[in-house]
Amino acid sequence: MTPDQRLTELEIRVAEQEKTIDELSSVLAEQWKTIDRLSKKLGALTDRFLELEEQTAPDVPVTKPPHW
């Protein structure tokens, strides 16, 4: 392999790696957006669940089932 061929091969590899890095970076950014969105939804659902639990908890007696 001549030095020019070697240099060309290395340049091709670098270009492919840069493309892969850019693609992975885009995917990672989208995943972080999804994680952030889902975290916010989970927080809202947790708050809603706790509110509903507080509303119904006083009405539900804590007793052992009859088979105990």
Curated annotation (Swiss-Prot):
It comes from the Bacteria. Disulfide bonds: none annotated. InterPro entries: SlyX (IPR007236). Belongs to the SlyX family. This is Protein SlyX homolog. The gene is slyX.
